[in-house]
Amino acid sequence: MNLICSILPKKEPSYLKLWRKQVIYQVLTDRFALDEDNFYAKASGNLYLGGTWKGITRNLDYIKSLGCTAIWISPIVKNISETTDCGQAYHGYWAQDMTQLNENFGTEEDLKELVNAIHEKNMLCMVDIVVNHMGHAGSKPVNFLLYQPFNSGKYYHNWQFVQNYDDPHETITGWLGDSHVNLPDIRTEKNEVRKFFQNWVSDLIKRYQFDGIRLDTAKHVEKSFFPTFIEAANVFTTGEVFHGDPKVVGDYQKYLPSTLNFPLFFQLRETFLDPKHSMFSFYDKAVLDVRHYFKDVTVLCNFLENHDFPRFFHETKDIALALNALTALIFMDGIPIIYYGQEQMFDGGSDPDNREGLWKSKYNTSNPMFRHLSSMIRTRQNLVETYPEFTYVLSFQLYIDDSVYVFTRPGVIIAISNEGSTSSFKVEIDLKEHWKEVPSSFTDILTQKTIPCKDHKLKIKSKSGLPKILISSDPSFL
């Protein structure tokens, strides 16, 4: 394989092989699509805006046209109904009843029709699940009788907000939230609680035919909870471990198949929003450290945006920086996640401004960012189909300096920089040092220009700080 690092497949659940091939599109159900088109309906705020499962079903072709192959939807269970100082539970993370659906999103039949429609389009469906906590509005004492099935105080840790998020005990037993909305912390260490969740998730997967799970606030749940829960679910599960240190997050992969790649997320934001941030540092922290501390980086879920952080375009209007960051996201080791609205260059700030109604974009598929992103995603999917080893062969560094990083994966060479649209770069790489067979030319997928490779030397030139995604003209060059 010519110096390219790989993680050879071992005996593992079949769902890992399946999910390595995916590009995930994250949807906030309330904010993606209404039952009927109304492009001028309210599209901001912290109240329910009317997005539904039917709305997603009607607009699956939009996601499909972007090239994404899996859809992650919001938590589906019934949430508290109060309007709090922080708004309503439109996001789905303030549960009240684990045994009922959130009627704001639709009916059981609507949900089943959505998952079935996703499958008919040869896509996968991932559901967001919260096992750590319930939701409570205001500062008054909690009436635990209102919750199902955990309708007694004995199922919850004593009230105390988390103060030190680096303290393992406090992180597990403390409550999240504040005096406006606090989140009663479930005693997930109790056997009867674990048994409920095992039966519940098994039934949930069978009833709705979900293909995967995103496990919210996994950092706040005992690690010993996960193995039996994962066994009961028997589908791909990625956990939210909100921490930038790969040593901290990587330890969770001993208990979970996958985690969200927060270490990469923070490095992507720092590197591509600050030209002073060295690519050497990016490579050390986002590539080498992640490989060192994680058991299998090929199943980590990578992201540049999500519902908890300001949009990338809120921090910069430089399209070149965004394209470079997205190129890294899509082609680095792991499974890419696109947060809805990235393709429309949404630029909202902190919650709830980063949770815009997508209908305000009129689901435009002709804008430059949508086209560029679609081209990248489809290129990745073509590589997955052409090179069976693409999903487990790790990226290999070809060149690096303070502002430019060039790496390769089967069938493609990627060059990214973080100096923005006012910059340019030029790199020459002798491919003979890395491969026995060297193609005569490459195609730049963003410009569709052919780049010759003379005497085994590839000259990569970029104007306006744009990334280079170079596809070999010879499929056997690896």
From Swiss-Prot:
GO terms for biological process: polysaccharide metabolic process. Ca(2+) 2 binds at residues 216, 240. Ca(2+) 1 binds at residues 132, 185, 220. Its EC number is 3.2.1.-. It comes from the Eukaryota. The active site is at residues 216, 240. SUPFAM superfamilies: (Trans)glycosidases (SSF51445), Glycosyl hydrolase domain (SSF51011). This is Uncharacterized glycosyl hydrolase C11E10.09c. It comes from Schizosaccharomyces pombe (strain 972 / ATCC 24843) (Fission yeast). Binds 2 calcium ions per subunit. The record marks 308 as: Transition state stabilizer. One of its GO terms (molecular function) is calcium ion binding.
